[in-house]
A protein has these predicted regions:
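Aromatic "clamp/platform" in nucleotide-sugar-dependent glycosyltransferases that forms part
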Residues: 289
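Conserved acidic donor-binding segment of nucleotide-sugar-dependent glycosyltransferases
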Residues: 321-322, 326-333, 342-347
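Short alpha-helical donor nucleotide-sugar binding micro-motif in glycosyltransferases
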Residues: 81, 85, 268-269, 276-281
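N-terminal strand-loop element at the rim of the active site
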Residues: 5-13, 17-73, 245-246
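A conserved mid-protein helix/loop that constitutes part of the nucleotide-sugar donor-binding site
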Residues: 16-24, 205-228, 245-251, 334
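A short, well-ordered alpha-helix in the C-terminal region of glycosyltransferases
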Residues: 335, 342, 349-364, 370-376
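A short, active-site helix/loop in glycosyltransferases that binds the activated sugar's phosphate group
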Residues: 146-172, 179-184
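Short hydrophobic beta-strand element within catalytic cores of glycosyltransferases
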Residues: 306-309, 319
Length: 393
């Protein structure tokens, strides 16, 4: 099968990892002819572009394809995408992220090519202006009429899009975002060795948070909970895994509270280090205020660690209270404090929740499960096209 994936940028992030693993799995496991089209990848978050271009993978960089809205560059991107897709003539076009999703779907539909789009997270949300919210909502409504199928990374994304009037329920299908599960099940290095490198003592309880240091990711909420947590349990250590523009301000905030010795920032780490860092931790906390389904939640469970998360978007599909972790109302700092303290003080509870999560979700989040489901969806779309049922919302 000839497939083209289009994504705005290949920074270190959940949507990008999903796209990269789809490309690799389709080419390596299924023998497909796969091309990845993306814009430039730059910034403190790090890039997956080098890995994407390894071996014989076909990667095309579209210089004008940028995240920020720029009418001239967006028009140029659309023209180039149309030209490249006309040249490549793929069986399926698969778009990801908002900008590439809108431009890519438009170009593919214009050429009559079968096209699907993955919703990794909603571009319209409660934390933006009304004008921006309405603009993104309209753009998604418009683009939904120019694709054959919408793939959600969790059921919550489907519910939000249907409620917003983007498309009817029968246009959506959920495919959980696959990942390489083995490094989480069996970390490449022993837990004790990694903890020693981090300067963590055997009695310390490490609370890990994996996310870009960026707005709405919830690092400030963890910091707000820390004084009460440490007053009750001074053995807790907070590990922030990731880089971003807020590292300086967050470190300053921690210093003002006199808590610098209790926090550690790893900075930018390659994805292959995340499993061993989670393995060296004792629980995973994720306080983001908007996500599709944060990959770190199943990753924490695959590592055998309980997870604490705000009840937003798809979190409740993997964070099951009393079974795999703690689900909290957003921005409820007292509840966040209590959840961290409960888990920090009960090793048996941590092990029970983590092992249950590992048992429930390992197969569901395997890369191979995702690529198999994607192929089934592609085939359904192609069959519908052959039968003259080009779907529109």
């Amino acid at each position: 099968m000839k497939i083209v994936h289009i994504i705005t940028r290949m920074i270190l992030g959940g949507a990008q990892e999903n796209t990269l693993l789809s490309v690799e799995g389709q080419q390596d496991d299924w023998g497909d002819d796969v091309t990845l089209i993306t814009g430039p990848s730059s910034g403190p978050e790090g890039s997956l572009l080098e890995r994407a271009a390894e071996g014989k993978r076909q990667v095309r960089i579209l210089p004008e394809l940028r995240r920020a809205i720029d009418p001239w560059k967006d028009w140029r991107s659309h023209q180039t995408l149309t030209r490249w897709l006309r040249e490549l003539r793929p069986d399926i076009v698969h778009t990801h992220s908002s900008k590439a999703g809108i431009l890519g779907r438009s170009a593919a539909w214009k050429l009559g090519l079968p096209v699907v789009h993955t919703i990794h997270g909603s571009p319209f949300h409660a934390y933006q202006s009304r004008v921006a919210h309405q603009a993104f909502r309209w753009a998604e409504w418009w683009a939904a009429r120019r694709c054959d199928r919408l793939i959600s990374v969790c059921d919550a994304m489907t519910s939000q899009y249907v409620a917003a009037g983007i498309a009817p329920t029968d246009k959506f299908v959920t495919v959980y975002s696959g990942m390489e599960v083995e490094p989480f099940l069996h970390p490449p290095r022993p837990r004790d060795e990694v903890r020693r490198e981090l300067g963590v003592s055997p009695q310390d309880v490490v609370v890990a948070k994996v996310a870009r240091l960026f707005e709405l990711k919830g690092h400030d909420d963890v910091i707000a909970a820390a004084p009460q947590v440490l007053a009750s349990n001074p053995h807790v250590r907070f590990l922030f895994i990731g880089d971003g523009v807020l590292q300086g301000p967050l470190q300053q905030q921690i210093a003002q509270l006199g808590l610098t010795p209790h926090f550690q920032f790893t900075g930018l780490v390659p994805p292959q280090r995340v499993p061993e860092l989670l393995g060296a931790s004792d629980m995973v906390v994720h306080c983001s205020l908007r996500e599709g389904l944060a990959r770190v939640l199943p990753q924490g469970l695959l590592a055998g660690r309980p997870v604490v998360s705000y009840d937003i978007d798809g979190a409740r599909e993997v964070v099951i209270p009393q079974q795999t972790g703690c689900l909290l109302a957003p921005r409820d700092i007292p509840a966040l404090t209590a959840a961290i303290l409960e888990l920090a003080g009960d090793r048996d509870l941590r092990e029970r929740l983590g092992s249950t999560g590992r048992r429930l979700f390992t197969e569901q989040f395997r890369t191979q499960t995702m690529t198999r489901r994607l192929r089934e969806i592609y085939q359904q779309v192609l069959d519908q096209r052959r039968n003259g049922r080009k779907q529109s919302a």
